[in-house]
Amino acid sequence: MSHVKGSPESILATQQSLTHLFDRVDATHVQLDPTRTSLTGTGGLVEIGKDGGQNWNYDMGFKWSSPELELNDIGFLKRADQKFQFFNLKYRTAKPISVFRNINLDFSQFNAFDFEGNHNRTQYQLRTRLRFLNNSRISSWLTHKPRIYDNTTLR
């Protein structure tokens, strides 16, 4: 959670910054208010999964940063007004197989929304990493992005 206070001019500058863009013409869930003297927002991550143990690992979760979240000097915030759903599935070999010291296969998927409910992004990725017995390696990945709508590039 964040709560920032300041003069109307400084809060207006925060509302208009690239992180927030309260003045977007397409956004109906936020309003640019030049008289405001504070912003209060939330952000977080809820994640469950399994790491370690056998060959299969996974994680899934949800993270968010509300439109008024402002980390200011205590952290890094590229963009507010986002909700992410994600899922990752990983297969790892722990023992050499044939000419490979280890094999890593990863599948990941995520969706991004804003707090107005707009579905802004979908992405799928498949990655492979093969390490040979002599420690040389080959990596490849395939990414599919059937939906990309970036509301910060509208300016």
Where are these predicted regions, by residue range?
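Exposed, low-structure sequence patches enriched in small/polar residues
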Residues: 3-155
